[in-house]
Amino acid sequence: MVLTIPTIASVAPVNCELSLDSGRCIKYVATRNSNPKNHVAEELPIMRKNSHQDHHDDWEGVNTICHTIDNIVNVEMETDFFDGKSVLEIGFVTGLPSVYAFENGAEEIAMHTMDKTSLELYCRPTLKRNNIPMIKTKVSCGTIEEAMKFLGGKKFDIILAPDLLNRQEAEFDLVHEILHQGLSYDGICLFSCRTHYANVDGSLTAFLQLVKRRREFEAIERWSSPRTDIIQQKVFQLTRSLF
């Protein structure tokens, strides 16, 4: 086995920007060229030539979430969507959705990532670069089981979850429980995902079947990449079931 050791240049944090169709720009900190896009438009993501998953795929999930919430605020004109709301970011956590939420009126933001390195090198610096007060933020890292402890019984108005389903299907029950425990009664969760993944057995179909079986949430598709993509990107909305 040959182990590939990351170079300093490949992990060094640099200042980046992601511009949105509305004209808004999210400033963030990440590795150079980690995000394949610096502008998000309606045609994202890049058309697939094959089904192989690379390191850019997680960022496509971030881009689609940012595109979706920007569309909600500036196209659907729900300008008060984040006003006074508590926001939780989980999944592939970068801080970009949280920054957008805070700059659009969120009262507080929380982030839980599985990677301590990304938390310290990229997520915290992203919050600092955008002058988000520490008193308004709560961050942690750890396993998906530790995410439940991080919630501590708190309910959030909005959960933003890029690439939420990029995991083994065996973890879906716990993911569902985190959403169930963490989302307020009248809250909304937006998650992005691929329809399926090359390296894990989790899939959108399996998760939606779980949601239907548990009957805690109603799932609505908010956005989809073209059907010509071999593996589509999608954004789904979850809200509490009324019955």
Swiss-Prot record:
GO terms for molecular function: histone H3R17 methyltransferase activity. Coiled coil: none annotated. InterPro entries: SAM-dependent_MTases_sf. One of its GO terms (cellular component) is nucleus. One of its GO terms (biological process) is epigenetic regulation of gene expression. Disulfide bonds: none annotated. This is Uncharacterized protein F22B7.9. It comes from Caenorhabditis elegans.
